[in-house]
């Protein structure tokens, strides 16, 4: 907001005195801070009181969804997600930055190409989405190491603490990433409005000071020193009050916390356990941070799923549209003002970036699927709530009351929480007292209104709350000067147009609803049947009752048109902001929100703008669709949909109507089994002629890992030697005495890892993996060895990613990968000298384009054969569907062409066949050099792997590379490998440019 000069002088005086002050403007209390940079920012751009944020002086609710750019590395598709978030009625996206991807080598920060954040920020601005930046340095995020690069395993200090070694290690990363964020702050015309230092800094143990104000202040100062001046917000993992304003050093500007109340039991998606619905968040907020707006920086939008889990379809069922209605509206009962859903779009754990407990997909059961589809009902349900919040500013200034089972509803089976407004309307959140109830409950309400206390319905009948449902009833709700005394039907949106006002209400199937309006005007049904609609005129109001119908009815009361919809019909409505200068909708300011039009258009409406006499809509279609536009400006004469002039009609109510035909294109995909597959053995290490002289020697007599002491003569921890990702290989040399009978080995790779062991060329056995096992002790019988002869033990270990570091003091991120211990029977451990390798170069990784985690330590990966156009001319012809006849690891490469039609968004999937009794094998699939599938046949669950356009060349040549690791003496093979697609979407997204896909080039020093 703009301050008067007198107010500004007072603030400057307070600044000079080094004091923070409070001032009141338009009835709201704002806090100004003594820090000059912060104070200057807050008085102009982002301020707050105890109710909400203000952006440029305008009160706003932040409704946000989490989206990680590193999990969708195609820039044009990032814009797609932003536009789908904007279409929900949301105004913000929260994002993490994964440190491990941009500083793979200490001191070398690389944020270019697919890791460049600036196109992500530009796309947010184009879509009109604010950003909450969360760069860590620790992020958790179900990412390898919680976002920590593997080399932190060597830091001589406690991670996430004020130990100097750790703080020094973070400086390079934070100084760079925070400077980039600072460049794109709202103060510089960018979209970033909030900055979160650290992440879920909530739990400590093991004698470490916690919470450590010195540490938290250091992280905050890192951001400030890099130029970050926007407010700092935190996300306590629970509502514990850590680092809340007023707690001293390390306090943030705005306190926030996380909540995942329904948990992560996707195996039982219909079970809502007793007591899981939060009821005390408002009370805790008033105790912990009463001067800041109530913020939940991560509220449950889905669930993770582990190796061997039920799959994300089950997670989306657990956290479905019913969950949203009950839990999100419950959050509204606490007057939440900053609400971020984790996740809104999950994406993909491509290239080994995930943590060990999760698989390639990070779909998360979120509203937008991993393949960017929005057909989950939870997306549409979320759109109803997002648009309601967008047009209900009175919600932010109402006063929340206590939940009650008496006083409002006539049954104790229902609980009502009031948010009472003075002149800005009141809101009543109604739910079942047993929140998990699947019963339908009939009820009447008695609500305080400007017309007195009213028992509703007045015209007879009862209201109904169906099972696992919740409603927000409004009273004295302002529709641009028209007072809605009450409405039991829920508000989707309302708008004031040049020729009148429009209010859109909806209800569930079979429900009866009623509203009352302060007016002396009569009720006229101007569209649809009058059947089921009743009304009554009083001296100062009109009351309307109706039964919800699947057929739209429109009633007119004075200059107000009211659309009466059922919920499923409301799902098809969109409220795009109407741009009049350019094509971008802009950010969600009150002026921009007021400019919106209402469009019924099915699958997706991205944008709307005026150009000359044309109204332009950009929209996506997955079926032939009738398009209707409500509130068309009088200057518009022609309709353009996706750039094409489209004939339209105008009905008596001024609604424009048109039809978009959907004619699905012919999609021709290659048969992957019939490609010209070439094969090379990618475990030459078990051949007698193999030379490992170029391998790093595992000869460190001490580890730099402070978590676990060595139990071997030299360190066999991979991160001691710079190997942090993908498959690890070890070769142990010894000279036999002839008395060795067994070899025991303890390997560690994280949940669901596997390992295999050979003696020279003889297969000894494998650990095929279980989700519950992060390490495994195995003992293998040896054949009779010849005294004096040299033998080599070859060990392959699947590094599933590094552990997260959630609890400060445990330092679990330092949990080593590799060999923990071994025993050659009858021999001292020193009898074996070891070498090891992972990805070629380790921290001096070869592929700077695809990043430090994408490739592992297999021979073919070290050579770069997984990249396009490997030197396969003289390789053997063989397919992964033929596979291997014995234990080992094969590498397969083939190319194919795609020629998919432009203007269509066609989700493509790699599908790996799986039987009920598969042989144990592990597969990696590289697409144009990017690892986009990691499959474990005996664990699962994922068999279908989305691969986005831009990674796949939709109109060009593509290269597939498959590594097949058979962990059984009988070998293994893929039962099938197919490319498939789901419903093509006629899209307005535009051209998608392929990411950089460097081809194979002989690597210097590759072994």
From Swiss-Prot:
Its main location: secreted. Keywords: Carbohydrate metabolism, Disulfide bond, Glycoprotein, Glycosidase, Hydrolase, Polysaccharide degradation, Secreted, Signal. Changing residue 298 to Q: Loss of hydrolytic activity. It comes from the Eukaryota. It catalyses: Hydrolysis of terminal non-reducing beta-D-galactose residues in beta-D-galactosides. The active site is at 200 (proton donor), 298 (nucleophile). This is Beta-galactosidase A. It comes from Aspergillus niger (strain ATCC MYA-4892 / CBS 513.88 / FGSC A1513). The gene is lacA.
